[in-house]
Amino acid sequence: MTYNSVSHICLVVPRHPEVSGGSTFVRNLAAAFRNHGLSVRVLSVYPGHPLGGDSFSPAADETDTIFVREELHRRPVSEGRPPWRAAPLALFKRWDRWRQLSALRRTMATLPANSVVIFTHVLGKMMVDESGFQRSPTGPLFVGQHHSSFASLEDEPWLREALPKHFADCDAFVALSDEDAAFFGSLLDVPCVAIPNPAPEGRTLTTQLAKRAVALARFSHEKQIPLMVRLFAAAITVPEANGWSLAIYGDGVERPQVAEEIEHSGMHTRIQLAGVVDDSATALSDASLNLLTSSLEGFGMTILEAACSGIPSIAFDCSEGVRSQLEDGAGYLVPASDETAYVEALRAAMTNDEERARRADRALTRSRSYDASTIAARWLALFDTLFPMDPPAPSEESSTAQARPESTHPCASPGVPSPRREA
């Protein structure tokens, strides 16, 4: 199949590059689109954090930031300042915001007509709307996304209002699993489809010989890293688990709680805060297990990254995205919130090398279904259902007509047109 309808992709993201599952998704998908011959541009709402090594080259040079002065725009200027200092800063903030959003509006207006703008989070679409950009009937497609599960909206209730409001004029919405696509479809009046994350390429298989577990995560409440420390400390109390250690890679607001839990566990010689690593392949290079303890997870990017290196993961059954990667023995899937079962699964993985190796093989085999080229092709196939394959030349009569045909995607309701952009 060939894809002639799209030549340019613009990814609008909250922050990029950085060490996170969402940023990894952007890197992998951008590389896959380029391999299909498309040009890719990344717009980051806030500044990213430069990554070392080859983990983002060459796309780092193609990332533009909307708000360079993040601290100025993320909080009220009156916070912690006397009025005589806040007043002039407020004027500067208004001017700077107008200037940056004007630049964003010009950027959107100059995108080629056969472009697709992918908003990986509603925040990016909110900025485009605030800029005053008006969509043209012949302008690019808009595709929304929420790079987490539908259940995550419970933790951020403002999203329930923001998503339907700002994604109302999108041509489609992409979720990470069929289950989430159905849930988001009940909230959004746009066609909702499921496309999982693409796998990283060029990973080296591990030997499965080291008694070493790893975790790669943002230290936020839904990742439950303090709980991970407690569960690992409980699992290694049996003699059969002698020699096993855990390296936790990442950082975040709960770092003090994680450090305190490690100290409280009495296992600080076997549980280590390993800092931030730019490339997950480095952290996984000598690991035999990958751990997740998330209560909310849209897909679980580290599960896929570990599987590509032949490493099985242990995780709670917190979403279809996680379940689809680990079920049928492709890892260790633990009933949601069942801490006892998690400890038992962890002990079983550490003490049965043959079974762990079998699950590692299944994880590796399943990871191939998320091949980056295959996932990119699914995105391109979606675009082809939204773009007319041979759009007619614009005429005076057709310039006021609808720019897109009725949606032919199976997620669209019969007889219900897909959302249209304002002329």
Q: What annotation goes with each model-predicted range?
A:
Residues V12-V19, A32, H36-R94:
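N-terminal strand-loop element at the rim of the active site
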Residues A259-G275:
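Nucleotide-activated donor-binding/catalytic signature segment of Leloir-type glycosyltransferases, i.e.
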Residues P312-F316:
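Short hydrophobic beta-strand element within catalytic cores of glycosyltransferases
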Residues D328-T340, A348-E354:
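Conserved acidic donor-binding segment of nucleotide-sugar-dependent glycosyltransferases
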